[in-house]
């Protein structure tokens, strides 16, 4: 169950990175990506507990 959730989050993250990398404001895109990545890491960490 958690493995499926992890895969889902990863695919979502890659989708976001693909969309954001196409934007011309790359600095904002990178900041958004880092924010999303931190949230995903937090969610995964909380689910493991």
Swiss-Prot record:
Keywords: Signal. Pfam families: YlcJ. Residues 1-21 form the signal peptide. Induction: Expressed during exponential phase (at protein level). It comes from Escherichia coli (strain K12). This is Protein YlcJ.
């Amino acid at each position: 169950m958690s493995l499926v959730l992890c895969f889902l989050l990863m695919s979502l993250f890659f989708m976001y990175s693909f969309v954001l990398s196409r934007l011309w404001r790359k600095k904002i895109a990178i900041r958004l990506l880092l924010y999303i990545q931190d949230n995903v890491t937090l969610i995964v960490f909380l689910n493991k507990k």
